[in-house]
Regions:
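C-terminal catalytic/acceptor-binding lobe
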Residues: 132-181
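Short, acidic, metal-binding catalytic loop of nucleotide-sugar glycosyltransferases
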Residues: 15-27
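Acidic donor-binding/catalytic loop of UDP-sugar-dependent glycosyltransferases
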Residues: 58-71
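Short beta-strand-to-loop acidic/aromatic patch adjacent to the donor-nucleotide binding site
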Residues: 49-59
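Short beta-strand-to-loop element that shapes/binds the nucleotide-sugar donor at the catalytic cleft/hinge
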Residues: 80-95
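A short, conserved alpha-helix in the catalytic core of glycosyltransferases
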Residues: 115-141
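Conserved nucleotide-sugar donor-binding
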Residues: 96-109
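Active-site nucleotide-sugar/metal-binding loop of Leloir-type enzymes
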Residues: 41-50
Length: 181
């Protein structure tokens, strides 16, 4: 199964790629300074089979295998979002690991351009009618990796979370103390 890793140069990019390869994925790294929307657009227009998309700031654990994602969720789900342990929050969080079945691709290709100017285009795509009527998007509570560890651009991360009004969910003080160890 193909795994697309999207990166802007995160410190954990190589580790993310290695872990996915170790777990049995054929990995394609998309690493540049373009937006997530641009990367998603390229992936959706290139993919022709089921795939996973993983943020490069996620270090996948041994749970994230082609077999595990194929067995997760309901049979009618076209898009599964998994959990990770978030280093910034020091808690579980959704996202960072997405499994998309080929049945979703026509709808993603048709809709991705509508969200080119959105801060979170992938989240917006989960809300299109084809994914909720009937329900085709599913959040699966399986923890598939560690998100945010060894972030070297903490200022950018904090600014992004503030822009999304998510800062209260994060434990920046604990993260900074852990990083100082």
């Amino acid at each position: 199964m193909k795994a697309y890793v999207t990166s802007i140069g995160e410190a954990t990019t190589d580790l993310c790629v290695w872990s996915l390869q170790r777990n049995g994925f054929d990995v394609e790294l998309i690493q540049d300074k373009t937006t997530l929307w641009d990367k998603l657009n390229r992936i959706y227009n290139k993919a022709d089979h089921d795939f996973v998309r993983v943020d490069a700031d996620v270090v996948p654990n041994k749970m994230l295998t082609p077999q595990a994602v194929n067995l997760a969720g309901a049979n009618i789900s076209w898009w599964l979002q998994f959990q990770t342990f978030d280093w910034h929050k020091q808690s579980l969080t959704w996202g960072g690991v997405q499994f998309i079945r080929k049945e979703a691709l026509p709808y993603l290709r048709d809709s991705v351009d509508k969200f080119s100017d959105k801060i979170r285009p992938e989240t917006e795509l989960t809300r299109i009618p084809q994914f909720y009527s009937p329900r085709r998007f599913e959040s699966v509570p399986d923890v598939m990796g560690l998100h945010g560890y060894k972030a070297t651009d903490l200022k950018r991360v904090k600014e992004l979370k503030a822009m999304r009004n998510q800062s209260p969910n994060y434990d920046w003080e604990l993260e900074e103390r852990l990083n100082a160890l």
